Amino acid sequence: MLKSGFYLLGGVVGAASSLPAFVAATTRSIWDPVNADDVAAVGEITALTALGHMKQSMMSDRTGRMILRTQPRVTDETLEFASRQPPGTFGHRYAQFMKFNRFTPNGRTPVAHIADPTLAYVMQRQRETHDFLHTCIGCGRTVEEEIIVKLLEWRHTGLPIGLLAVIGSLPWLSRQQIRNMELYFEWAEVNAPNQRHGEVNIPYITNVWWEYYLDKPYEQLLADTGITPIDVFLQQKKGKTALANGEAIDGK
């Protein structure tokens, strides 16, 4: 958490150095929090410090190093491959998500504010795999669900846009949704990177080769990443609350 605060401070410095662009993009993204172009611009302008950490975490991991070396891209061809996968696979779920939301990988906004080519790729990779993360954790594209995804990205990457997205989206949330933020922060913490012995291993999402799992069972992805989908977490919380109150989990 302290590291994330450091990356947020670095993001503030980055914003100050590109103040006009930052203010313009932030204003537009608050007005329209699902506007991909402006959210992307804010993310890049505030990302430099966090991107350095993301690169280091990838360099210290075998899969991460391979991703940096080969620089795979998520394209419409990736989606075509996923759409041919049978039900039960991660690829099928991903293709269904993309079809329902009328998304195409090639429609992703290209990185425009990061000069270093390696860091630019790291940012591009993060952007292109965003929909994989949506699919993995079971979130759609409402403002509230985007916040959930951004919080997990923030815990894994330190990118300030995660917290900025929460702050900027508050005017669009109901009181109940705002109260739910405590649960979402807890869920993101449960799913934070973890390599402690004897505990569930959760790799940095930057070190997950998502494309490898497209033709694999969805459950294999969850097992290998250690990530608990948001609906599973909420059901677990509901069950624990019921037990604490002396109730049956099924409410009977």
From Swiss-Prot:
Keywords, comma-separated and alphabetical: Lyase, Membrane, Metal-binding, Mitochondrion, Mitochondrion inner membrane, Ubiquinone biosynthesis, Zinc
Cofactor: Zn(2+)
Coiled-coil annotated spans: none
Catalytic activity: a 4-hydroxy-3-methoxy-5-(all-trans-polyprenyl)benzoate + H(+) = a 2-methoxy-6-(all-trans-polyprenyl)phenol + CO2
Entry keyword annotation includes GTP-binding: no
Compartments it resides in: Mitochondrion inner membrane
UniProt-annotated binding residues for Zn(2+): 130-131, 134, 146
UniProt topology in membrane: Peripheral membrane protein
Pathway(s) where this gene product acts: Cofactor biosynthesis; ubiquinone biosynthesis
GO BP, sorted A to Z: ubiquinone biosynthetic process
Gene Ontology CC terms: extrinsic component of mitochondrial inner membrane
Pfam families: Coq4
EC number in record: 4.1.1.130
InterPro entries to which the protein is assigned, alphabetical: Coq4, Coq4_euk
Domain of life of the source: Eukaryota
Matching HAMAP family: Coq4
Further remark: This protein may be expected to contain an N-terminal transit peptide but none has been predicted.
Entry similarity comment: Belongs to the COQ4 family.
Protein name: Ubiquinone biosynthesis protein COQ4 homolog 1, mitochondrial
